[in-house]
Structure formats: structure tokens, C-alpha cells
């Protein structure tokens, strides 16, 4: 009898320190094939811990992606779930020091944002190494499953707990693409604080194609 941790022992060994996003993409298919083979050989699909994460993935992924204008099919959700459990249940996992350039971080940023929200919903109490590893490989994986077509970044800033987020989500869903991001501003926010937040955002994105800011001017300080 093999435990749920032993079945995935050393499965993350195909990822080595120093990999960038391109190198990670090259080994993802092998990683998925190895996961599937081990699951089938040991008939472990139905054990409670695996089923628990499968349900969390199926209940969360498309609800979150909908607000960005996308959805995954059942096979893609299955792939996502398999990668999550493989990393969580690899008893030999120690992390990998990937080397992601600033250029790649900007290029893949929107995929990273989506994966971060999904992992917030799916993961429980796991250490930073596990979270960071999954964040990186799943960001690369998602970039092959959904395509962000818009090259222009657009940011909505409004006062209210969810006002900007709701507007951005609805617009992205109608467009069918991740165009708008949102800053929901507290009622008492100062203009200086807002400027700092926008500047931090601009540093993290690619602005060669332009940036659109939609601001609720009526609620800003004069």
C-alpha cells in the first residue's frame, strides 16, 4: 500500500533551479504525463484528500476566470487539479529557485494575477515555497490555455467596497478578454495615497501600448 504522499514522491524533480518561464513550459507536458501515469497505476483518484482538492478546483476556477472573460473546459480543470495535488503531496518537495526576469514578469503578469486569485480559493495552510512554486508553474500553464488578447492595460478607480471590481468584472466578461483591472478605494483615501498605488501598478505592467485610467473624479479630493 502506498500513501498519498509516496505516490507523488520526487515528481517535481523535473523542475530545476534557474528555470525561467520558457524552460518551465518545456517540461510541463512531461510533468502532467507523469502525474497521470502515477494516478492510474495506483488507482488513487478516489481518495478523500485528492477528491477534496478536485472539488475546490471545480467549484472555484471558472467562477474566478469569469470575471476576466475566460473559462476552462473540464479537461483543463482536471489538469490544473492534478498539478496542485502532485505538488502538495510530493513528500520530497523542497521548492525550486526559478529565475524569472523582469520582462517575463510583466509579460505574464495578468496570468499570474488570475492564478493568484485561484490559489487563494483552493489552497489552505501551505508554506510560501509551495505557494510560490504552484504560482509559477500554473502561471505558465494558464498562458497556454487562455489568451489575453488586449495589449493595452486599463485601470478603473472608484470609491466603494466593490464598485470598481464589479465594473471591471462585468466589462471583461462582456468583452471576453482581460482588459480592465480595478482599484476599490476607501471613502477616505487621500489623493497622494492613490497616486502611490497607481505608480506601483504602472511599474509592474507593460505600458508600451498605452495605459487607460478611468477614475471616479467626483469622489476625489479637489
Give the location of each predicted region.
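A cross-family "folded-core" feature that marks the main globular domain of proteins
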Residues: 1-222
